[in-house]
Regions:
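Active-site neighborhood of HAD-like aspartate-dependent phosphohydrolases
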Residues: 1-42, 183, 207
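Short, acidic loop-to-helix structural element flanking the phosphoryl-transfer center
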Residues: 2, 75-112, 151, 194
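Generic enzyme active-site microenvironment
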Residues: 4, 114, 170-171
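Generic structural signal for small/hydrophobic residues in well-ordered secondary structure
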Residues: 6-9, 53, 113, 138, ...
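Alpha-helical elements of Rossmann-like donor-binding domains used by nucleotide-donor carbohydrate transfer enzymes
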Residues: 18-22, 45, 59, 63, ...
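Acidic, Ser/Pro/Thr-rich low-complexity regulatory regions
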Residues: 25-32, 67-70, 104
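Metal-dependent phosphoesterase signature
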Residues: 46-94
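Asp-based, Mg2+/Mn2+-dependent phosphohydrolase catalytic module
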Residues: 118-119, 123-208
């Protein structure tokens, strides 16, 4: 069985609304305003380009600052250090460790990741977190110039590691990404919590 993990909001904390509230308190003075500003920044084509590896950080900062009328220095400080905000989620890391331990007992079990992640953040996570060595492989979007939920990135992971779709479970917090994986014939589950994921793996596949 192949288990394919997303990173943001699955293995690592990702709270864009909180980021906006902390960095731009006047513009994001209410939860609603913070959510609106977060969507305007992180759901925009420019951020997707940064995720995809086709837009450089400085270009992203300049465009976003002008488009959303945000202080460029504050925005640069935010964007340059987002990798430091991506902290491991202990419960999910513990579940990953359980799967890593089980892997030695099951010859057909493999662990992979598939993450939309700008190149600077991807390299920082690789340097900081030894548990990423538990994975047998994976793909960061910025390294291959494709992003979820576009089918090409799923197909690339599948071909690179010879994944059998019916023996692959994809785990992501965003429904469009889950549906895209299912469109490739993979099993997929929308992540809510480590407990929910553990129960799903146990019930559907007999592990854990």
């Amino acid at each position: 069985m192949n288990f394919v993990f997303d990173f943001g909001a699955v293995l690592f904390t990702w709270k864009p609304v909180d980021l906006m509230a902390q960095c731009f308190p006047q513009r994001a003075a209410t939860p609603e305003a913070a959510a609106e500003l977060a969507h305007a920044m992180f759901a925009h084509a420019d951020w997707n380009g940064f995720d995809q590896g086709v837009l450089e950080m400085e270009v992203l900062i300049a465009r976003t600052s002008e488009r959303l009328d945000l202080d460029a220095l504050v925005l640069r400080e935010l964007v340059a250090h987002i990798d430091e905000r991506l902290q491991p989620i202990p419960a999910t890391v513990a579940l990953l460790e359980q799967l890593h331990t089980l892997r030695s007992q099951h010859a057909d079990m493999r662990l992979y990741y598939l993450s939309n992640m700008p190149r600077p953040y991807a390299r920082a996570l690789e340097r900081r977190h030894a548990f990423l060595q538990w994975f047998d492989g994976g793909i960061f979007s910025s390294d291959v110039l494709h992003i979820k939920p576009h089918p090409e990135i799923y197909q690339l992971l599948q071909s690179r590691y010879a994944l059998e779709p019916t023996h692959t479970l994809f785990i992501d917090d965003l429904l469009p990404n889950v549906l895209a994986a299912q469109g490739q014939g993979w099993h997929a589950v929308q992540f809510e919590s480590a407990g929910q994921l553990q129960a799903h793996i146990s019930a559907q596949f007999g592990y854990l």
